[in-house]
């Protein structure tokens, strides 16, 4: 393996956007002497991580999955949200073979069509317009028993904003003449990604048996009761919605179960609980044999029909480094480990040759405002050791704090999170200086720079569409304006003196002065 004289580290500060408005801007109010010094001393600018620049609809806020796919692939990758919305607009969705087969089989067997997913206009993990299209398609194909299991958001949307969505779907089912909302539960339970199976089991029992902490005859009533219990959308307890006869919905042999989330990372655990025969995350009271369909590909080992299989991305940064005989390291905490590996590699699970991975466990706390530094110290310990080992040409690291603490809506905690990351960056930059290394500091999307909704006054827990920082800690250089996340991989190759493959349509942003 060849080694560069200057190993390059890419530090991705998750959820770290730039915002002129300083009100409730945790990044602005944090004491960040390291980043202040680097911005004063080195070339820096701002790049785009949202909307059309990352393959999302115009104006759509960025997110971690999308951000890392663009960062790692070096091209604008049209995201599942855009792709599926286009299929609906073009009337291709209603003819999708995987979806049609599942619905038709359930109808033929006299069974029900169960549709589950994040009922939200957030567009990060799902979109309620896709769920509506699925409900319409099921009824159009003859399904009379259509049950919607709604996971509530409050994270990529305002904390208490689900009422409009639930009311809309109540009206939709009335218009269609068939179907109803069968259950509601917060995404905190249904969409865990950190092996907290006690949470997922509550969603599983709710969907399979209608077993819930609470029962109501209407979804909006259930939501209002949750608010009375001081539960925001994300944390709504399992609530079964009964029909006119007081009965709950249950999942039975021969039914269809269609998962309408298009983002993989928070869809995997609950999917495995439904389809893996050897599943051992929790004890399942029932294991109905259903026609399970995933909207997109969640993981290579999840064996279920996929409505929209992944598009194959070749010559991503990781693959190019492998093919050029270079070494690389991917490192992050549990919460963003999939992002610096699976997503950064264009949806490939297996590491490339010469690619090492280090996973640091995220702290076991209910919400990260309780420990805003998360595991950043341990992460940095490992990262500094890796730099000093001089084993790697390229190091990709994600610090999750800005995003994970930003999502809690806790301003003071978000400030502490930013300060913790700043201190860690100082250690990383010092370690790189000792070995003649350089680094690019950027982000995948914004979050912590806006901690309150200026209109409603509610906590702002979602991502933003703000530009993100782009700092080059290295040789004297200039940085082009108007960059985007897909320019980062070509920039790294350019700094290494490597040719940029044709598949990478991004452009190098950093130009070293001779």
UniProtKB/Swiss-Prot annotation:
Keywords: Glycolysis, Isomerase, Manganese, Metal-binding
Top-level taxon: Bacteria
EC identifiers of the protein: 5.4.2.12
Binding site for substrate: 125, 155-156, 187, 193, 263-266, 336
Pathway(s) served: Carbohydrate degradation; glycolysis; pyruvate from D-glyceraldehyde 3-phosphate: step 3/5
Residues reported to bind Mn(2+) 1: 403, 407, 463
One Gene Ontology biological process: glucose catabolic process
Residues binding Mn(2+) 2: 14, 64, 444-445
GO MF assignments: manganese ion binding; phosphoglycerate mutase activity
Pfam families (alphabetical): iPGM_N, Metalloenzyme
Needed cofactors: Mn(2+)
Cofactor binding: number and manner: Binds 2 manganese ions per subunit.
Coiled coil: none
Active site per the UniProt annotation: 64 (phosphoserine intermediate)
UniProt cross-references to InterPro entries, sorted A to Z: Alkaline_phosphatase_core_sf, BPG-indep_PGM_N, Metalloenzyme, PGAM_B_sf, Pgm_bpd_ind
Function: Catalyzes the interconversion of 2-phosphoglycerate and 3-phosphoglycerate.
Subunit composition and interactions: Monomer.
Family annotation (NCBIfam families): pgm_bpd_ind (TIGR01307), PRK05434.1-5 (NF003897)
Annotated family: Belongs to the BPG-independent phosphoglycerate mutase family.
Protein known as: 2,3-bisphosphoglycerate-independent phosphoglycerate mutase
Phylogenetic placement of the source organism: Bacteria, Pseudomonadati, Pseudomonadota, Gammaproteobacteria, Alteromonadales
């Amino acid at each position: 393996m060849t080694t560069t004289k200057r190993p390059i580290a890419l530090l991705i500060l998750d959820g770290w956007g730039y915002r002129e408005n300083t009100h409730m801007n945790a990044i602005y109010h944090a004491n960040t002497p390291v980043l202040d010094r680097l911005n004063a001393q080195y070339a820096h600018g701002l790049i785009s991580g949202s909307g059309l620049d990352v393959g999302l609809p115009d104006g759509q806020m960025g997110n971690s999955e999308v951000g890392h796919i663009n960062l790692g692939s070096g091209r604008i990758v049209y995201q599942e949200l855009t792709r599926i919305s286009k299929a609906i607009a073009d009337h291709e969705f209603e003819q999708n073979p995987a979806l049609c087969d599942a619905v038709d089989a359930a109808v033929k067997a006299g069974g029900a069509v169960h549709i589950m997913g994040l009922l939200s206009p957030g567009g990060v993990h799902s979109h309620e317009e896709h769920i509506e299209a699925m409900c319409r398609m099921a009824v159009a194909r003859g399904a009379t028993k259509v049950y919607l299991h709604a996971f509530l958001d409050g994270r990529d949307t305002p904390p208490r904003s689900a009422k409009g969505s639930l009311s809309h779907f109540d009206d939709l089912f009335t218009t269609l003449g068939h179907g109803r909302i069968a259950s509601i539960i917060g995404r905190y339970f249904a969409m865990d990604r950190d092996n907290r199976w006690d949470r997922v089991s509550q969603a599983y029992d709710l969907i399979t048996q209608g077993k819930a902490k609470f029962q109501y005859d209407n979804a909006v009533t259930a939501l209002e009761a949750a608010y009375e219990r001081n539960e925001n959308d994300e944390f709504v307890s399992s609530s079964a919605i009964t029909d006119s006869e007081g009965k709950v919905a249950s999942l039975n042999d021969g039914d269809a179960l269609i998962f309408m989330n298009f983002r993989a990372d928070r869809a995997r655990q609950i999917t495995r609980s439904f389809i893996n025969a050897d599943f051992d995350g929790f004890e399942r009271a029932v294991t109905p044999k259903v026609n399970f369909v995933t909207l997109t590909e969640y993981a290579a080992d999840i064996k279920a029909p996929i409505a929209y299989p992944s598009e194959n991305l070749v010559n991503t940064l990781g693959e190019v480094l492998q093919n050029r005989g270079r070494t690389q390291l991917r490192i992050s905490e549990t919460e963003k480990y999939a992002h610096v590996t699976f997503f950064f590699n264009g949806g490939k699970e297996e590491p490339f040759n010469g690619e090492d991975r280090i996973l640091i466990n995220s702290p076991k706390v209910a919400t990260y405002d309780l420990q805003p530094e998360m595991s950043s110290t341990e992460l940095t310990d490992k990262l500094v050791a890796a730099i000093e080992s001089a084993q790697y040409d390229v190091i990709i690291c994600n610090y999750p704090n800005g995003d994970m603490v930003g999502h809690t809506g806790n301003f003071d905690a978000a400030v502490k999170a930013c300060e913790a990351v700043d201190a860690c960056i100082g250690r990383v930059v010092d370690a790189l200086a000792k070995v003649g290394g350089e680094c690019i500091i950027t982000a995948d999307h914004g979050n912590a720079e806006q901690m309150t909704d200026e209109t409603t006054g509610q906590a702002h827990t979602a991502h933003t569409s703000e530009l993100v920082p782009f700092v080059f800690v290295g040789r004297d250089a200039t940085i082009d304006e108007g960059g985007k996340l897909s320019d980062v991989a070509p920039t790294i190759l350019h700094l290494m003196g490597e040719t940029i493959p044709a598949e990478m349509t991004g452009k190098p942003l950093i130009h070293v002065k001779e």
